């Protein structure tokens, strides 16, 4: 009897031990799955933040609420996504064809009066001659009179059904040529938008770390997908970030120089890439009546008020005639050397941006001979430039903007900062003027980088106006650039998106706008660095704002 009892106890212990062991095994397996799910959720969230989008639609773990800046970025991107929806295509023949599309002048006349509006109805078709049922084509309208060195942009209204209304204001008399270029079909524009926002790796940044007589280069970037130790260069307030692989035996503070090069990567398919061959970019759509005659008709021009900051230029905001830029929304004065000298007396002028503003600081001494460069003992073309006229107490300074700054040349990172931080350092007063431009160097990167910077600049200007409302701030939009370049990285479609974003973000600020996009279309320059006569007219517009 006692042996049976002992046997039963032994069996009970063995069964209990087996049950407990089985339960531990099951729990451990489920915990592993749960931990894997959590880890997957974290990695997906990080990837969405760093490589695709700041705003993942779903997440398996609670996320921190979006900041005000992140919400604004999200809102702007959602609006742009609606304007540039996916346009997949099975064959190039189903994309927009300049040859098969028709442009018809509405209510045509033998002659027109100066100041009239001329409208063109554009109906787009594909290469098979079929009517397109949606819009989104990237078009450029321009009128010109080469004999008069005259030009102006046209306004394009997209009805999103395959038809467009193209409007020209006839600003001058004479024979006028009309041009309507298909820069990219809607399918190409959609592909560029998708490809742009897919990755940060189209540009390779190489940082040079210097420690005494030794130096080493490491890879850097706006994001880095690496398990190696990183140097983090963060601006928490404006949510800006830049990273470098940490070199051995050197501190992160030893980062002194930077250079970039293009990475051989594309997010376009072969079929999409075929839309950007040289022969398919910037194709003329006006085939029949290209020339019209415009007479004066004794029309009087309205006398507008003088140009002031806070005015919002229409499109077009002016035109060029005999090489001079003439605004249509304010009475702009053509300043001679004497007036320029008087205007600049006692002024502190800060040019913050890229090389299209560096052109300004090279131009000033050609007109104002008393302005001389002051040697700051820096090297390279991207160093800080300083012009001084001690007698008239005039100072003009140019500084490049911070990352991303794309160039094969090695540039210094000493005294190198984001534009919002540069603005924060300026006390400002009625004799201080700031000119800001950025965008060309942002084109190869996802759009959230540009939007975040624009919002940071907007907030810095608002802070400046709180402490010094009399300071003049001027925003210069991007120039159009070469049509036949690396379209995926640097094409003007990306610049046009920047143009729309800048207008939206800065619309409520009391700033002056130099619409270089409109101006360079009117001049027909098609180069990132336009010639001196264009730079001179941009500067003349600036001086009208501050004098």
Curated annotation (Swiss-Prot):
InterPro entries: Ig-like_fold, Ig_E-set, NXPE4_C, NXPH/NXPE. It is found in: Secreted. One of its GO terms (cellular component) is extracellular region. It holds the Pfam family NXPE4_C. Transmembrane segments: none annotated. Its main location: secreted. SUPFAM superfamilies: E set domains. It comes from the Eukaryota. Keywords: Glycoprotein, Secreted, Signal. Glycans are attached at residues 39, 211. The keyword Protein biosynthesis does not apply. Residues 1-21 form the signal peptide. Belongs to the NXPE family. This is NXPE family member 1. It comes from Homo sapiens.
